[in-house]
C-alpha cells in the first residue's frame, strides 16, 4: 500500500470507467490534460477492449499506478474500491452522468482540478468500509467487503423477513419487516437514508443498523461503535445484498455478521470540499418551498 502521493514522481495513472457514449471523448480529454504533466494513462481491460487497445486487470492497475481514476458514477467508484480494498490505492472520482456523493468532480472541472492537484492542492479522505462475514453451513466463513452497505431482505417480492440480531455475542433484537441495512458512514446517504436511517459524517468510526419498514413502531436505527460486531440469523427466505452488486442466499448460510473494517478507501478530493454543503445541495436543505 502506497503511504502517500508524491506529486513530483507521478508517472502512471490508471482509469476504470463505465461505458457511455461520451467515453472516448472523456478519455481523450483526461489524457490530453495529464500528458501535459508527463503522466502516462493506463486503461482497465474492459475499457481498453471497447477501444481495441491493450488493458490491465484492475488489481494490476492498482499495484502499478500512482493513483486510479474512476470515470462514471458512484457505482463505478464503489466497485473499484471494493475490488482493490486489499491494495488501497488512491482513487479520484470523476463523474460522467448524474452528480453523486462520491464522484464530485465533473469533466468540465478536470483541467482546473489537475492544475491544483499538481500544485499540491488536494486532500485525501479515508472512509472506513465494512467487513461482512458469511458463515456457511459447512463451517467455513467467507469474508467480503462493503463500501456502502450490506442488506438482508426477503428473496420474494412483498414477503416479510424475521431476523434475529446479536451484538458482540449477546441477543439484541428481533426484526420483523422488510429487512435490515448495515451501513458504513459513507453508506448512510444511500439505501439507509431512504429507510429513514441517520446520516453520519463519512469519516466517523461508527456504523448503523437500520430496519426496513418494520412492523413495530418501536424499532429504530442504532449507531454502533467501531469495535462492535453484529450477527444476523434468519429462517426466512432471504437474500444478503452487498452494495447492490453481490447477492447471496441466506438459506445457504447459518448467519451473517458485520463490523466496521480496518480497511478504508483513499479518495482524492478538492481542497476544502464541504460535505455539508453537498448534503444541502443534493437534499435541498435550507430552501423555503
Curated annotation (Swiss-Prot):
The active site is at 74 (proton acceptor). NAD(+) binds at residues 74-75, 148-149, 178, 186, 189-194, 245. GO terms for biological process: NAD metabolic process; NADP biosynthetic process. Its EC number is 2.7.1.23. InterPro entries: ATP-NAD_kinase_N, ATP-NAD_kinase_PpnK-typ_C, NAD/diacylglycerol_kinase_sf, NADK. GO terms for cellular component: cytoplasm. It is found in: Cytoplasm. Keywords: ATP-binding, Cytoplasm, Kinase, NAD, NADP, Nucleotide-binding, Transferase. It comes from the Bacteria. HAMAP family: NAD_kinase. NCBIfam families: PRK14077.1. This is NAD kinase. It comes from Campylobacter curvus (strain 525.92).
Amino acid at each position: 500500500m502506497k503511504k502517500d502521493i508524491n506529486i513530483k514522481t507521478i508517472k502512471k495513472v490508471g482509469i476504470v470507467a463505465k461505458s457511455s457514449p461520451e467515453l472516448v471523448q472523456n478519455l481523450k480529454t483526461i489524457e490530453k490534460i495529464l500528458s501535459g504533466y508527463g503522466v502516462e494513462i493506463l486503461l482497465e481491460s474492459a475499457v481498453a477492449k471497447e477501444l481495441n487497445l491493450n488493458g490491465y486487470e484492475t488489481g494490476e492497475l492498482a499495484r502499478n499506478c500512482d493513483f486510479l481514476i474512476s470515470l462514471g458514477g458512484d457505482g463505478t467508484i464503489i466497485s473499484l474500491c471494493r475490488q482493490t480494498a486489499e491494495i488501497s490505492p488512491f482513487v479520484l472520482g470523476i463523474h460522467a452522468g448524474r452528480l453523486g456523493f462520491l464522484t464530485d468532480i465533473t469533466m468540465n472541472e478536470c483541467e482546473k482540478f489537475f492544475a491544483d492537484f499538481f500544485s499540491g492542492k488536494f486532500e485525501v479522505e479515508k472512509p472506513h468500509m465494512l467487513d461482512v462475514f458469511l458463515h456457511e453451513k459447512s463451517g467455513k466463513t467467507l469474508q467480503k467487503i462493503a463500501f456502502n452497505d450490506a442488506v438482508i431482505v426477503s428473496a420474494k417480492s412483498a414477503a416479510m423477513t424475521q431476523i434475529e440480531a446479536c451484538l458482540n455475542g449477546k441477543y439484541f433484537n428481533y426484526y420483523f419487516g422488510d429487512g435490515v441495512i448495515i451501513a458504513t458512514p459513507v453508506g448512510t446517504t444511500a439505501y439507509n437514508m431512504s429507510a429513514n436511517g441517520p446520516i453520519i459524517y463519512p469519516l466517523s468510526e461508527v456504523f448503523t443498523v437500520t430496519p426496513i419498514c418494520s412492523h413495530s413502531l418501536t424499532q429504530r436505527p442504532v449507531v454502533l461503535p467501531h469495535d462492535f460486531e453484529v450477527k444476523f440469523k434468519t429462517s426466512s427466505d432471504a437474500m444478503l445484498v452487498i452494495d447492490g452488486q453481490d447477492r447471496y442466499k441466506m438459506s445457504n448460510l447459518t448467519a451473517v455478521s458485520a463490523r466496521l473494517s480496518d480497511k478504508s478507501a483513499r479518495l482524492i478530493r478538492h481542497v476544502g470540499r464541504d460535505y455539508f454543503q453537498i448534503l444541502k445541495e443534493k437534499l435541498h436543505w435550507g430552501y423555503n418551498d
